[in-house]
Amino acid sequence: WVTGRELHVANTGAPLSAAGVRSLTALRVSAKAGHRPGARDIGARDIGARDIGAAATDAADIGPVEAGVGGDDETPPAVGRFGVGFTATATIADTVEIRSRSGSVLFDRARTWAEIETIGVAGALTARQVPLLRLVWESSRGPADGFDTEIVLTVRAGIDLDGLLVGMIAEAPDLLLELTALSEIDIAGTRFVIHRRPHPEVPDVGTAIVRGGGAGERAWLVAHGRSASWLVETDATGAPVVAGSDVLRAPTPTDIELSLPARCITTLALTPDRRRVHPDADLSGVADGYLSLMLALAPASRPALIPRIGLARNDIDAAITAAVLAEVTDGRWLPTVADGDGVPGRAVLFADLTAPLADALGDLVGGLVCVEVSSPTWLPVLRAVGVDEIGLAGIADRLAGADRPPRWWWKLYDALSPLVFGPIEVEALGALPVPRTDGRLNFGARGLLIPRIPGTRACWITGPDPEVV
């Protein structure tokens, strides 16, 4: 909220500690339990509304306000441990006060400049160049009622406070998804709430519902892996709303563009400016959890999460895409007619498969992809993960040794007939087995005689069994 030229950001949870103050004045990662190596404070740069809000909460850990999906009972969720970067506050303010129930401190650029002038070390510095977060003074003011810590920024003239709040409101839903310790954000009376619950069927997957801001609600599936969480928004039917383009988040956005269809929030080590992945970061486990995200979707929607090859925006995007493709290629997630969820490399797809044809072929064509996923639309992405395509000729070949009663063959022909439009399809089915009157199979209908009187059986006539005619 805003009062005059003061921007207030308050939270609940663990209060400010002496170690935290020392870390803030040293401009390094804050000494907080569970802190991830490689997370560092950001430097002065162009800061967005999201950075200001997240950086202010970095001054104190947030306690467990709501049970998060996949949470650890022994380690409470935290915001500050991520080192979002408290130095972002210095880009819009010359005075920053941290009011906490354990004690309060004040950073003041003018007072710092006065101290520098007093000891005669100002040199070529100007008052504007003096670092804000180096010297700290004690403050006697406590946080607002109902909060454990409050950050008060006296915003410089010329900065549009209303515009800053509008930006924060726009970014609040994403911030709730990225910082899992948060359950609610209120920005000048505009309230956002997130509700998390575990998925009823898939372990390590949950749903997150974000409400508020006058925009209704948005639902997300969230899968947790070793070094990343994977998210995809879903519509009212549960189908994925695939991301067109996004950036890697750790947990808030970096500058690394991603072309993946799902959002990635990683714990990978970053460079000091928190904009790039550290050169020594281990990407081997980043795809862990992606398969669980796919399994949480309805079978017909799962191929939507297969990454498109050749669209990588940068080397990190290419590496993560390759890891995800390897996970998807080797995993058991593709719904098949007879075998449940199967491995793509052992599956075959017949484009425009119908339910009657699937019922007839399911136990004869191993790994036949189910009807819901047999649209030609999915064929290019399914090929990328090892799925083979089968046509009418392939079906005929695979039925060469089938031992089925004549009535079964009649049902098969009936299921195939809507797919035969002309001589091309007839030629493709030229070797389709036909049961004969003598109990044997004929490969194709050529050479078979059909009696003039329907239902007639004559052993001396080489014709199709009457039950299939």
Set out the residue ranges of the language-model regions:
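A generic secondary-structure signal for well-formed alpha-helical elements
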Residues: R28, K32, A93-S100, L176, ...
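Structural preference for long, well-ordered alpha-helical segments in enzyme cores
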Residues: M168-L176, Y290, M294
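Acidic/polar loop patches that form or flank catalytic/metal-binding clefts of enzymes
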Residues: I98-D108, E184-D186, S301-L305
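Amphipathic alpha-helical coiled-coil/helical-bundle segments that mediate oligomerization/assembly
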Residues: P131, W137, E150, V155-A157, ...
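Generic structural motif
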Residues: T12-A14, G70-D72, G103, A110-A114, ...
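GHKL (Bergerat-fold) ATPase N-terminal catalytic module, capturing the glycine-rich phosphate-binding loop
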Residues: W1-L153
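A broad structural signal for short, well-ordered beta-strand segments within beta-sheet-rich domains
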Residues: G4, A93-T95, L176-T190
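Short, conserved charged micro-motifs
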Residues: I159-V166
